[in-house]
Amino acid sequence: MGSLESERFVVDVAASNLDK
């Protein structure tokens, strides 16, 4: 159920980390 949300969160974090 929270798989999609978890993936979305991971992608958001990864994007933020890359932007840094």
From Swiss-Prot:
* Keyword entries, A-Z: Lignin biosynthesis, Metal-binding, NADP, Oxidoreductase, Zinc
- Which example biological process does GO assign this protein? lignin biosynthetic process
Name the Enzyme Commission number(s) assigned to this protein.
1.1.1.195
What cofactor(s) does the depicted protein rely on? Zn(2+)
Record's catalysed reaction(s): (E)-cinnamyl alcohol + NADP(+) = (E)-cinnamaldehyde + NADPH + H(+); (E)-coniferol + NADP(+) = (E)-coniferaldehyde + NADPH + H(+); (E)-sinapyl alcohol + NADP(+) = (E)-sinapaldehyde + NADPH + H(+); (E)-4-coumaroyl alcohol + NADP(+) = (E)-4-coumaraldehyde + NADPH + H(+)
Domain of life of the organism encoding this protein: Eukaryota
Pathway noted in the entry: Aromatic compound metabolism; phenylpropanoid biosynthesis
Q: How is the cofactor bound?
A: Binds 2 Zn(2+) ions per subunit.
Record keywords: Oxidoreductase included? yes
The record's GO molecular-function terms, alphabetically, read: cinnamyl-alcohol dehydrogenase activity; coniferyl-alcohol dehydrogenase activity; metal ion binding
Q: What does it do?
A: Involved in lignin biosynthesis. Catalyzes the final step specific for the production of lignin monomers, like coniferyl alcohol, sinapyl alcohol and 4-coumaryl alcohol.
The family assignment reads: Belongs to the zinc-containing alcohol dehydrogenase family.
Protein name (database record): Probable cinnamyl alcohol dehydrogenase 1
Origin organism is: Pseudotsuga menziesii (Douglas-fir)
